[in-house]
Amino acid sequence: MANLIIPNEDQHNYIVGIDFGHGETSAAICPIEWGKDAGQRETKILDIDLDIAARKKVITSSICRVSGGILIGDEAFEHTTDNNGIRVCFKQKPFSIDGEAEKLMIDYMKAVYARVRESQEELSDTNHIVYIARPSGWTEEAKEIYRQMAIEAGIPLGGLTSESRAAIFYAKSPNVNFAKEISKGAIVFDLGSSTLDFTYLSDNDKPIDFGYDLGASIIDNAIFENMMQKDENIRMFTEKYPAYNDALKFKARKFKEEAYSRNENSKTIGGFPLGNIIADNEDSYDEYADVYVKLRITNLAELNTMIESTTCYMKRLKNALIDFKENKIPEKSVNGVFLTGGASRMNFIRPLIAETFNLPLDKVKIDNDNPSLTISRGIALLGATDVITSVLIKKLRKKILSLINNEQMLAKLIDSLVEEVIAQSWDVVSSTCSYWVKFGKTTDEEELKTLVDKNFKDFQRNKVSQIVNDTLYHFINETSEDIRKQMNEIISRYAPGREISSTVKIQLGNIEAINSSLSDMSKAITEICDSISNTLVDIFWKAIAVYLWGIFCLPYYIFKALRSDESKRKGKASEILGKKAKVTSQVRQNVKAELGKNADFKNSVTMSLHKYFTKLIELNLQKVIIPIE
């Protein structure tokens, strides 16, 4: 496992997020406001100039190795054929840190990070952590190699996150205000150079990711093949000097971006002489330097028609939208779509999405500032939250011991158990007395006691176990809610919006893991049910016996002369039931004493509750932790 930087409150002051995209690269910086509660934090995200001279935040993912250094972005095109030549759109899933493609990517990472340090003078060697994004769908092995590549490039890496998750995080921030849609169910639509990725989110579902090979480079290639190479001279040039194809495709991309950034009725002219991309000392310069590459459209409709007729891109995009809707998220509610990636500005994207998901156009949102910066901003914001949350988790774990007070919990559980047992036990006494009054044969104490004894045995077999289980269930539910509230008091200070949500039912999360922690309690519960049941009759009769002599000792013949047997039984039963408060008070003391002196019960229950709530807290902490890889 790569050695990632561990956040240090005394050392790190800044988070840098870098999006090494397939087509373009951007970076953002965010200060870590350690000493401030959430309500006091400003959480400023600043975009970093990666082309310092031109003050450009986004550069083309291009690299050219030249003698004496490495050039990236637009500068790379000034040395098209030097040494190994220019490379664009070279990012790919890594397979070996020693591979040629991986070494090229390491060089690019190193050069971009150097630009970050040059642009942001406040950064020192030790006062910041960098987080980077990676495409969805990479294997754990590929992620590990990518981490190692970043570290090899000299980047102080805090971890990776998926591009879609970074976009989601930014979409939920106040900068975009898309959190409401996400809570009800929404999609993040990430159109990159190589792939189109969808992520469905809602508060009630795990994220659903899926990608399609519909990156915007398809359109770059269409412009290259059907507009540039339409000229015979250009076609011959590319056949004779294929090393220039990447440079020409870069120009095609720039033309596409320029066209879709304009009003749809505006013309776009992006032609240039080949001399702009051919080095002066190349043999091809004299022959082709003056050849003009024609790039011109009257309006976007003309460009869209060419794209559709040659690539069927819009039809394929529509099919991908339908496939995701019907096969990946069937019956899911879609309340909005958030677009990210520079290519999402193309004018046919939003209407297609709105039509497919039956949404008003204003529910298909785009970061109008610059969608090319969405991922890097999201990474920086997510990284800053990660380091703050890492401190929060440490505080919460220290808090566990105080959240789980064994003695208090046991006392509360016993109180709840005793009250429920007494209430339902007295119902047995009451219902038995009523039956005896109506159907008794005598007015003798022994007859009533026999009936009560029989009914208590039924109560033992059929009711006590359920009482204990129900009491335990409600106790766990209430205690879990108390713990949740105490945890949220801490969470809201550090990471508002990540509080553990309240639930009507006990959400056990990993049910098997938690149930295993309660297994020790099962035996003790069974034993205590038997213990309570077996002694319950004696406990009640000991409590009632104090009052029985006075009730049953009067001469039988006096009552017989004055009243019927049923009337006498009713009088005696009323006398007994009238002693409810005194009897139940005595029973309460006796049952608590029985439970209190049962060491096995006390030990197994306290141990099991501690294990249960420790695991429950840990599972809830996993919901708070930012998913950094």
What does each of the following model-derived ranges do?
Residues Q120, Y146-G185, I219-D220:
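Hydrophobic, small-residue-rich alpha-helical packing segments that form membrane-like cores
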Residues V130-I145, E331-I353, D367-P371:
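Glycine-rich phosphate-binding loops at beta-strand->alpha-helix junctions
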Residues G185-S202, V387-V421:
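Extended, charge-rich low-complexity interaction segments
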Residues E33-G35, G39-A153, A222-I223, M228-P273:
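Phosphate-binding loop and its immediate beta->loop->alpha context
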Residues E163-N175, D220-N221, K365-N405:
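Glycine-rich phosphate-binding/hydrolytic loop that grips phosphoryl groups
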Residues N3-A38, N175-P207, I379:
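Gly/Thr-rich phosphate-binding beta-strand-loop-beta motif of the actin/hexokinase/Hsp70
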Residues M1-P7, Q11, M105-L123, S164-A179, ...:
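Phosphate/ATP-binding catalytic cores across multiple sugar-kinase/actin-like superfamilies
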Residues D74-N84, I218-P351, M409, I414-S522, ...:
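Gly/charged contiguous loops adjacent to phosphate- or pyrophosphate-bearing nucleotide/cofactor binding elements
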